């Protein structure tokens, strides 16, 4: 029947990568390399071990000390130690919360007997009795008062031979050091007004993070590092620590010059380049032990990434140049493993990555100067590829690595289906790295570079980060685009052609005779007979069929059937039948497209009509996998398609793939399907209508949705070419026998042709309605 064309396409369509649609990018240069193992063949070549050489250490060393800073009053950051380094006796530091704590730390030199000294603390002169019995260590004394007009009292001391003192705000407390070096420890005071604590040092000081408290304690007890005690270290003002760094815009557009019509714009951009290699592996004919070619192909990749908060859509095309041709011949017998040619990229090769994104920089990239780029290096390593031999152990090509180094950037153009993209071509030179690549169970070993068998090594893509800058001559009016951006590509021309073809196709529906449609629907239309009416089809039959199958592979029908085949057997065995209507959603999805299961929350509130609509939407797939003798909607669709192709003057072999794909998805949107159980028929349409009736009397009966779900799971599904409404109308006006009713229910094409030959208006009108639904 005519639906054979769809089944044939489903059975023979194959996946085609984007790279098949891209012609050769740049020039190609091949270099033949002959490997002569010589006397070292059995010892895996000469005993030479190549390594990567010096490897740089990228460890980041973070400084501990921040300073020194000059004395100045400031708000000590919470969670940071202030390490004071006074040079002589006197007041070292003051700190207060202006409500319950006034702390002043004084320093007393060694060997001081008890005496009274005058100190200026918080702006007032105070006489303090001091002493230091130690002859070697300096003494820090904490003088504290708890009221603004109170008297100072000694709260703690620190004997130090390093002459260093520490203070920190943290956890609503004030921390200091007490005791005697080298065993000084921290002490804390509760501060009432923690947020307003202000510290004023009277000596040079350093800032140390609390996370480095152990280092601070080490300095207090044992002194600063020698580098801090040289005359080359000069204290700076504390305000320098508060200078806010100016945020430089990494991605910016700068007007270099401007006239009335044109302006020069400098575009600076950070970019992330993602690319991947593609390959072609061709097996020779024969017994299955020979491979003809393993080669690199250009590969497209589209992705998104964030740049300064902007979502950027980028497109790359990766190609190689200067490949090296290798070969392997395991013997002259038909069962000896051999590869006629396999490509390898190494030191004498180049990798080209064409990059484009949707930013302003690429909008008018026609006249460009001062183009520069700086990219990181990236290491590419090959993966495993097993040569599946009919018998014996499989050889495996594995390993290989190269590093890509930036070698320059030029302008280029990428061609896609819809538009030509002015882009940047980044050129990379290669350096061979470890490991080498080998072919196991052969003498091919210790070769350097990446072979084309599996150049991505299982990765989705390689990534390079970098930056480019260019100056572009663009129109002064930002809304205007240079002419090259409006150029018509092959795909754009085809789109305009398809629009004209759709209009012509839809007008041809009225010219199709119903009798001719039935005749065509009953024919087993294959690929050649379906397209035989197109000029030059005979001469280009192979390429035309390939293009049709390639396009049809991406259709909704092909992808749905593909998933159905994988899930049908597992899903049918896991059907959970329930007395509740809610179970129907899972019952239907057991054999339908599993990825589109209705959520439980939706099923709880769904009506019978909506559930029937969901089920009937999948019945086309069920019918395709279980062919019946009756005529189905795809037979009608295929027949209409054939009739319109024969009459059309717009269709050609370039437009045909799009026509076939669109017809499979859009022809006859309103379909009804039925299942028969004895004398009972159940019918459901994609519009949510459902009927249950007796075949002999055509009397309606209650629609048992649970039984319907069981039947569509286990029984053949039939296209309701003559739906229940038409059938009942036919019986009421003309009367039909039980046998005629069964034949019409089963969509018997001979019976349908008989009614049409009798010029039955009801049947004829129904078929004409189906023809009118075959629109693009």
Swiss-Prot record:
HAMAP family linked: Rota_A_VP4 (MF_04132), Rota_VP4 (MF_04125)
The keyword DNA-binding is annotated on this UniProt entry: no
Region (Spike head) residue spans: 65-224
One GO location term (cellular component): host cell plasma membrane
DGE motif (motif): residue ranges: 308-310
UniProt protein name: Outer capsid protein VP4
GO BP term (any one): permeabilization of host organelle membrane involved in viral entry into host cell
Pfam families attached to this UniProt entry: Rota_VP4_MID, VP4_haemagglut, VP4_helical
SUPFAM superfamilies given in the database record: Concanavalin A-like lectins/glucanases, VP4 membrane interaction domain
Note, other: This strain probably does not use sialic acid to attach to the host cell.
Signal peptide boundaries: none
This protein's record includes keyword Coiled coil: yes
Coiled coil location: 491-518
Region Spike body and stalk (antigen domain): start-end pairs: 248-479
Similarity comment text for this entry: Belongs to the rotavirus VP4 family.
Residues under site feature: Cleavage: 231-232, 241-242
Species this protein is from: Rotavirus A (strain RVA/Cow/United States/WC3/1981/G6P7[5])
Keyword entries, A-Z: Capsid protein, Coiled coil, Disulfide bond, Hemagglutinin, Host cell membrane, Host cytoplasm, Host cytoskeleton, Host endoplasmic reticulum, Host membrane, Host-virus interaction, Membrane, Outer capsid protein, Viral attachment to host cell, Viral penetration into host cytoplasm, Viral penetration via permeabilization of host membrane, Virion, Virus entry into host cell
Stretches for region Spike foot: 510-776
